[in-house]
Amino acid sequence: MPAPAKTGQALFLGLELAVDQLRASIVDESLELIGVEAIDFDTELSEYQTQGGIFTTPGDAYTTPVDMWVKALDFLLEKVSRNYDIGRFKSIGGSAQSALVWWKSTPIPSFPALDSRLPLHSQLSPNVFSLANTPVAQDTFSHSHALALEATLGGPDHMAARVGTSAHASLIAAQLLRVREASPDVWARTGRIQVASAFLASLIGGSWVGMGEAEACSTGMWVHAAGGQGHWDDGVLDFIGGSAEEGRRVRSWLGEVDVSGGGRRIGTVSRYLVERYGFEPDTILASFTPDHLSTYLSLCPSPADAVLSFGPMDLLLTSAPHYLPTRLYNIFPHPAQDPSEKRKYIIMLNSRNADVPRALVRDMYTKSWSAFDRLISVVPPGGSIGLDDKLFSYWLLQGDSFPLSHVKGIFRFETGIKVNEFRDLRANPRCLVESQVLSFRVRWSRMVATGILGATAGRARGNNFVQSASSTASPVPGATGSQSGRTGTPVSIAPAAATTIGLSFDPYDYQSLPSRILTTGAAANFPSVASLLAEFRRIATRLQAGSLGARL
């Protein structure tokens, strides 16, 4: 039996279902971190034999066992209950990676019937899931299905205008289509699907939780509309299901979407958690969100800031005052806003070629992260001191976001000539990270040129242009409202030199850049990376825009 509740300051529990771990962060009323607990999938649940929390198979398929998440939650709650006074927790919220949970039509479990004397994983056995190993965000096996959907909807621009996103490798709609075509037995026995964040919230709350609109907008099946009038696209569902009847079945799997903006409580914790661990019955269950959006929210950025998250996929996120979908970026309704306020949105640029290329370059040229960091620091920008003999490298191990979705390979250039390897091997770490940052620099400016950020855009200013998450104290003072902080001149028209090479922006103009870049993730801990990011606008002046596209 759990210990009786003790008096003391209120605590708040945040759960994160990451690719490699299930983590719990405990904070107090002042948002001071009290402690962290984690279950590492590879080491503490080694019976599943995952590597980095996932299985890899030929064909760029990356999956993870859903049953492992359930067992990890049992272990994590045991850790938390041993080390903290459970009765002091007032609220639980969380986030999760991008993945789907496929429930069988029979038996769909009754959460209120769970026996508090038994762990969750003994009652939610693997046979309740129609798909035991579900694709994760790194999975690209469904890319051809995403392209088929895109073609059906009239191409990338028409698809983005209709459902808010164009085709990409981990599109949820494409995963559904692939399962129907490749695994009809899984399709036939499915009765419900949930995104991972809603799945985790359901386990904590003891009742079915639907996805929020921010996640629905990323599926490729949702039509966003003002005033909370969004809806599932019947035409897309019919295409995925193969018929109108199966389309209606998919609609029933998806369930209702929370269009309130996420600024409300889902409910309270389940009777199971109250009886087994000693949570108070009135412990609030807050909205659970996708991990990338929770990262953005956790740093409390101002509207003029951008958040750069390094990880298995690198992400650059910022806010937007209105909904203007294009193929150039992903856009989501803000997951935590008051329904009475003007709607806000979050834009995301992503790169699939992130941690893996960095780790490969480390292994090939330095053998350690400290040496990797050192070489980035000591090698001059562009890999050489001279102005005319700069080096470029592009590590595209997976098809990346538009316009590089069709390109794969490792490409190096010296003095404008493609080479197999640099003469100075030490330039590789620096040139890799530069190309990753330059990719975001170019795509940011293309995004700004669409007008999504309004008539004005942020100005990169001062020495505080880049801040790591650990050093971020507060948003820019006085930055309020949908466009506060995005000061400076209107977005400039691209000069003739830029337009002749097909650019819609001036690559030498830094005034459209964000006021600050708040960085998080493992790579953000490298001083060299922070220093390189501070050169965000300076290194752009040596970018021969379009050089990669012209040479590939």
Enumerate the language-model features and the residues they cover:
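ATP-dependent carbohydrate kinase catalytic cores
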Residues: 218-339, 470-498, 527
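Glycine-rich phosphate-binding/hydrolytic loop that grips phosphoryl groups
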Residues: 147, 291-298, 349-355, 359-362, ...
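Activation-segment/catalytic-loop signature of the eukaryotic protein kinase fold
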Residues: 388-537
